[in-house]
């Protein structure tokens, strides 16, 4: 049997070992699912909204017996959707409580995250805010064991199976508690017993910060009393802190798309989608599959553009333009920090700063190295390097050693954190070898096929990891061109820019690319000392927005297909939770995995026909509570 300790550090002095877990036998099937949400009676009305003080059961993995959640011995749907995948849904009319129930999940995860991350370095990530007056429980199943997270006002309890529960405290005796979870325990616990949640909600009304600012919150800083911790949190919405990933996916939830005060930037979202889609579309083409039915990739064109890099130096980090524009490597005897970084990457020999492309690549390496050192908890020991505006300072011996160790650590890191560094190094090496013609790359659009021939050194790029590795660096703009097919025949005379696709088609691309991007990033984290989640919870709120019924009909099958084709479920377990008004989506989900809501209450499914593979009209009538039939109200009258 395997035992491990979950420790709490008290005021950074004492380690109190208060918890151990017993692993299941190796033969236990890998599984993960969210099973029950329980709203407790003293939960604030502002938080539960129209929900009731009751249990909400998401699937048939658990039973509620005498106000207690009990795990069934067998999972009747084990393997139903494929290895290590579970799909479940919440349905109900508008106002029935679907999104409110999701928000309870987000708050529970947020509060636990506040306590787990307390004392951890998250320099470029937003502060987390602990939600007060939350009394709710979240039950989930991991590999045959029932886990419980209970938010009980100023404390959070966690229990796995029949073992003793762990209590983490936000406020104790009127003061912000100084308890801190050790990083080593956090890492092990996250991998084995917790999950990462990726949320999408493209509704214009969703995630508006102003809707949450009335909720009482705390900022958990040592030395503050309860009142001061609440005062310092005033004006902040806890939800705003969950849009960022700049802590290396340590905080176990991310909301999409990114919103600033409730507003999301469509142009920025589109730009991110182009970057995420590039590797996915190339992968699909190489494996003779279509990422999207009726469309094939025609080409991806890259155009050199150094303006965004200049903005980072000059506008974000306040480097004077004359310093940025005139920078060249310093003499050998008196290196500056930028030069030392380039030396440690081994790119100085033959580097020509008068060559625009080489100079841009070198300046990007300097920028990105500073960014990694200052952004990610795994690189905390290198934060003393300082900010980017110090890159021209002379190197002292201590800094020289720090830079050398930093670069070596980045070079060993094969996760998403160092990906853009690796892409830039491949590009720079190709430039120096002469396989890239600078003039052509400066003045022309470059096809992705042509680019790969220049940089991949003859490798057959077929895996998603390899394709991502050899994509162009961030100082290239991306243009994706598609071909459209009907009955197997191409119908477009000229390639179709992705911007000319319909709103529904682009929404389809945005949604799928978001999930694939984040999951691949999570799975790229391999180092044992970093937080690695291997249970992944995908929440899709009103996923059918902009989708034609045919897209809705195919949605679940397509999502399952991507998970399997990219082998994501080989090393991770997935729970897919969908709030929907679509009978087509519901027809792919067995009744045991559906929570029916009406007026904030769970409706028992007795008398409701199982929607799996059922007639759409039957599903509309019974599962979506269409009490007035299927005819428009004006016509009915």
Question: Model regions: which residues?
Answer:
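C-terminal alpha-helical "lid" subdomain
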Residues: 622, 626-637
